[in-house]
């Protein structure tokens, strides 16, 4: 789910967010971005 993406995906502060994108899409979201080292999923 959304929280599992945030927990397990580490990323640069404003950098690469490929992990977030993939994880969020698998969780049923449109994608994700990186915000202060955490993944934020787009609903």
From Swiss-Prot:
Major place of residence: secreted
UniProt-listed PROSITE patterns: ERGTX
Function recorded in the entry: Blocks Kv11/ERG potassium channels.
SUPFAM superfamilies registered for this protein in UniProt: Scorpion toxin-like
Disulphide bond pairs: 5-23, 11-34, 20-39, 24-41
Family classification: Belongs to the ergtoxin family. Gamma-KTx 3 subfamily.
UniProt subcellular location: Secreted
Endpoints of the signal sequence: none
Listed Gene3D superfamilies: Knottin, scorpion toxin-like
Keywords: Disulfide bond, Ion channel impairing toxin, Knottin, Neurotoxin, Potassium channel impairing toxin, Secreted, Toxin, Voltage-gated potassium channel impairing toxin
GO cellular component: extracellular region
Name under which the protein is recorded: Potassium channel toxin gamma-KTx 3.3
Keyword Signal included in the entry's annotation: no
Tree of life domain: Eukaryota
Tissue expr: Expressed by the venom gland.
Disulfide bond as UniProt keyword: yes
